[in-house]
Structure formats: structure tokens, C-alpha cells
């Protein structure tokens, strides 16, 4: 398990990476980072929320498809419920919101 400061650094790097990937690829999303929350808004107003839950050292995604909690396991962020990969869930949510294929590369 990471220390709290390691978790915060890792999650901030991940949030920055997501924003950079969206900007570099020109996908139609606006990103806002405030506190522990990265809000990604599609052109039609659909939102995907990515936040960190520091006490449990989890990343959470909230999207139309549902809510997901991810814990770090061997260098990957995997869903606590079904072991789905963070990037798979995020890319599906972003693709559904934008109507085009979105693929955020792994950090």
C-alpha cells in the first residue's frame, strides 16, 4: 500500500495525464480539477466524474453507466467489484458521452 502522499501524487499525475490526453487528441470535452475531483464534461453536458478517496486510497468514476471504485494492485488501478481496468471503464464512459471512440493511453 502507498503512503498517503504517494497516493495523492499518483492520483494527481493520473488526473493531469487524462487532461493532457484529452487536449492532445482534440476530443470535445472540458476538464475541471477542483480539490479531489476531476470533472470531464462532454459537449452535450454529459459529465464523467473522477475523484480520489484518500482514506481508502481509491479512485472513483461516476458516469451514466454507473459508479466504480478502483484500488491499485500491482501497478494497475482495478475495480474493487469486478477487477475491470480503470482505463477501460473511463474510455467506455468517455466514448459513450462523446459518441466517438476515445482511448486514453495508460500512464
Curated annotation (Swiss-Prot):
Q: Entry's PROSITE patterns?
A: FRATAXIN_1, FRATAXIN_2
Q: Which InterPro entries match?
A: CyaY (IPR047584), Frataxin/CyaY (IPR002908), Frataxin/CyaY_sf (IPR036524), Frataxin_CS (IPR020895)
Read off the Gene3D superfamilies from this record.
Frataxin/CyaY
Q: What's the name of its gene? A: cyaY
How far does the signal peptide extend, from start to end residue?
none
Q: Which UniProt keywords apply?
A: Iron, Metal-binding
Among Pfam families, the record links this protein to: Frataxin_Cyay
Query: Which family is annotated?
Result: Belongs to the frataxin family.
- An example of a Gene Ontology BP annotation on this entry? iron-sulfur cluster assembly
Q: Cite a GO CC annotation.
A: cytoplasm
Tell me the protein's name: Iron-sulfur cluster assembly protein CyaY
Cited function: Involved in iron-sulfur (Fe-S) cluster assembly. May act as a regulator of Fe-S biogenesis.
Amino acid at each position: 500500500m502507498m503512503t498517503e502522499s504517494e497516493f495523492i501524487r499518483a492520483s494527481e499525475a493520473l488526473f493531469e495525464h487524462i487532461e493532457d490526453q484529452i487536449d492532445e487528441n482534440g476530443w470535445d470535452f472540458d476538464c475541471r480539477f477542483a480539490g479531489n475531483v476531476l470533472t470531464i464534461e462532454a459537449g452535450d453536458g454529459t459529465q464523467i466524474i473522477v475523484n480520489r478517496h484518500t482514506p481508502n486510497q481509491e479512485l472513483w468514476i461516476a458516469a451514466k453507466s454507473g459508479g466504480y471504485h478502483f484500488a491499485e494492485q500491482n501497478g494497475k488501478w482495478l475495480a474493487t467489484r469486478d477487477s475491470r481496468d480503470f482505463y477501460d471503464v473511463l474510455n467506455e464512459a468517455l466514448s459513450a458521452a462523446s459518441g466517438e471512440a476515445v482511448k486514453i493511453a495508460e500512464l
